[in-house]
Structures are given as structure tokens and as C-alpha cells.
Design a protein with these regions (language model features):
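A short, conserved acidic/glycine-rich loop-to-beta-strand motif
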Residues: 85-95, 100
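Catalytic-core segments of class I nucleotidyltransferases/pyrophosphorylases
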Residues: 60-65, 70, 75-83, 96-97, ...
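Conserved N-terminal catalytic core of the sugar/cofactor nucleotidyltransferase
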Residues: 1-66, 77, 155
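Hydrophobic/aromatic residues within well-ordered alpha-helical segments
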Residues: 12-15, 85, 168
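Short beta-strand-to-turn element immediately C-terminal to the catalytic PLP-Schiff-base lysine
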Residues: 103-105
């Protein structure tokens, strides 16, 4: 809540009951905390967000923060920048060494993805050439506008969020 968030939904899978017990033992830390249960089937980030759509019914942007990410980034500032830039999704990225990179044009709009280890690339854009774009590593932190849920209708219950963002990047600012 120190970063301005007072409603949280947690996707649970591994040690799900321990997470629920911990939150309940701490009186939900004085904020609204709900759970989206994936103990029977992991849905990947995209499917997890889609399953939790019911929680985001107030038409306000929301933040997704992967559990295995430690960061000292100012989350309040990330949310503020998202509101200022008018994007459907704002992805927190950095210049760091990894095998997989998101590829951005000069306006910082998402245009593709590359796996440097395997050479695999993905892009919805014709004539895509990875060397023409800036490589940034995705942090697993993102701010989304609820309008993206209607675009998820054509995606299955389980899907990778990067594939979704790439499909959106044709018509939306990502």
C-alpha cells in the first residue's frame, strides 16, 4: 500500500495454501487481497491475467508484478508514467544481460522479441529485422489498462503474455 496500491489479487499455485494462510494470519495487511487459484493448472502470465479479469472491473489501470522479481523500482512512478503515456500496456524493461529480449523502435514501442541463444524471433510486423531495434530485458513488471481484456478473448486459457503483447503491438501502443 505504500506505493499506492490497496487492492491485490495473487495467483496461487505452488504452496498456495501457505500463501493464503500467511495473508489471512496478517489480516490481509489492511488491504483487499483476493486469490486466483491455479493449483490445478498453471496458466502462464497471460492466462493468469485473463482468469483474474473479474477483479479488474473498475476500468482503472492495474499493475502485474511477477512473484519471482525483486526490484527497487518506484512502482508509483511506473503507474504514473503509464497514465501519462496513454499505452494499453507499459512494460518495465532494462538493459541487462539475458538470452531473451523485447525489441523496441525509437519511440519505445514494442516491435518484436528475440531469443539470442536459439536465434528464434517473433514479430507481427512484415519485413522485421531484429538488428534495427533496441534490445531490452523484460522485468516481469507491467501496468495494463482493463481494455486489453477484450483482446484476450481470442487467446486460450493458457498463454504467454509476450505473445499477447506482440499481437497487441500492431494496433496499440505497448
Amino acid at each position: 500500500s505504500a506505493a499506492g496500491f490497496n487492492e491485490i489479487i495473487i495467483n496461487i499455485h505452488h504452496f498456495g495454501q501457505q500463501i493464503i494462510d500467511f495473508v489471512e494470519a496478517n489480516n490481509s495487511f489492511g488491504i483487499r487481497i483476493e486469490f486466483s487459484d491455479e493449483r490445478e493448472q498453471l496458466l502462464d502470465t497471460g492466462g493468469g491475467i485473463k482468469k483474474a479479469a473479474w477483479f479488474f472491473d473498475d476500468n482503472r489501470p492495474f499493475m502485474v508484478h511477477n512473484v519471482d522479481i525483486l526490484s527497487n523500482i518506484d512502482l508509483e512512478e511506473v503507474a504514473k508514467q503509464h497514465s501519462l503515456n496513454g499505452s494499453a500496456a507499459t512494460l518495465v524493461c532494462s538493459e541487462r544481460e539475458t538470452n531473451r529480449y523485447l525489441l523496441f523502435n525509437e519511440q519505445n514501442h514494442l516491435r518484436g522479441w528475440i531469443n539470442k541463444k536459439t536465434g528464434e524471433t517473433k514479430s507481427p510486423f512484415t519485413g522485421f529485422k531484429p538488428a534495427n531495434y533496441t534490445e531490452l530485458a523484460f522485468s516481469g513488471i507491467q501496468v495494463l489498462h482493463p481494455s486489453i481484456f477484450r483482446e484476450m478473448d481470442s487467446f486460450p486459457g493458457r498463454f504467454y503474455i509476450i505473445d499477447f503483447y506482440l499481437s497487441l503491438s500492431v494496433t496499440y501502443k505497448i
